[in-house]
Swiss-Prot record:
Disulfide bonds: 35-40
GO molecular function: hormone activity; identical protein binding; receptor ligand activity
Swiss-Prot/TrEMBL GO biological process terms: amylin receptor 1 signaling pathway; amylin receptor 2 signaling pathway; amylin receptor 3 signaling pathway; amylin receptor signaling pathway; bone resorption; negative regulation of bone resorption; negative regulation of osteoclast differentiation; osteoclast differentiation
Residues found modified as Tyrosine amide: 70
Protein name: Islet amyloid polypeptide
Pfam families named in the record: Calc_CGRP_IAPP
Encoding gene, per UniProt annotation: IAPP
Annotated organism of origin: Canis lupus familiaris (Dog)
Proregion positions: 23-31, 74-89
Length: 89
């Protein structure tokens, strides 16, 4: 008898939920919660680093990312180089 009442209750509940209207909330808090976890974590980390760098000063020197930095490979050298055999087969 209880098993027959369960589908009826579920149908009534689903109909009731479909008739409810969600009221939009206009708040800054809700806008902040829309971002996904990775974006929020990245933004929080960036904000934390900006705040702490003002207090502690620069711990590491800035990274040189220009076109003449050490480690930039010349494509001609890469093409002329032979295959690398690290492991004997």
């Amino acid at each position: 008898m209880c098993l027959l009442k369960l589908p009826v209750v579920l149908i009534i509940l689903s109909v009731a939920l479909n008739h409810l209207k969600a009221t939009p909330i206009k708040s800054h808090q809700m806008e902040k919660r829309k971002c996904n976890t990775a974006t929020c974590a990245t933004q929080r980390l960036a904000n934390f680093l900006v705040r702490t760098s003002n207090n502690l000063g620069a711990i590491l020197s800035p990274t040189n990312v220009g076109s003449n930095t050490y480690g930039k490979r010349n494509t001609i050298e890469i093409l002329n180089r032979g295959p690398l055999n690290y492991l004997p087969l």
